[in-house]
Amino acid sequence: MQRHMLKSKIHRAAVTHCELHYEGSCAIDEDLLEAAGLIENERIDIWNINNGERFSTYAIKGERGSGMISLNGSAARRAQLGDLVIIAAFAMVDEAELQAGWKPKLVFIDEGNKIKGHRDHVPTQSWT
């Protein structure tokens, strides 16, 4: 059996560009792509923390070290500059890989879209 699992997440990225007339996609700083284990043309889901919008597109490379998160084409209508988004990708993982210790790559970034930390799990949520 295979399970559809969270593979990669870039948490609380600030949108730096919205390019309505650019070919559709989301340009992501290459440093962030690599840290999250994402590759060019990979399908990504984007969840806008500010307005609740959720949509899918694909990743393209943004200038390395720039902090770029550019929503292009119709995706540019889903956010405003400065909105915080979560960028995620999923993968089909078989039971053997899961039992062997497969983990997602979670990347946490600061206000300038620079990496401030990594994790390989989402902590258990509690009421405290």
Swiss-Prot record:
Cofactor list: pyruvate
GO terms of biological process kind: alanine biosynthetic process; pantothenate biosynthetic process
Pyruvic acid (Ser) carried by residues: S25
Localization per Swiss-Prot or TrEMBL: Cytoplasm
Enzyme class per UniProt: lyase
GO terms, molecular function: aspartate 1-decarboxylase activity
Reaction equation(s) it catalyzes: L-aspartate + H(+) = beta-alanine + CO2
Assembly information from the UniProt record: Heterooctamer of four alpha and four beta subunits.
Protein's name in the database: Aspartate 1-decarboxylase
UniProt source species: Burkholderia vietnamiensis (strain G4 / LMG 22486) (Burkholderia cepacia (strain R1808))
Taxonomic placement: Bacteria, Pseudomonadati, Pseudomonadota, Betaproteobacteria, Burkholderiales
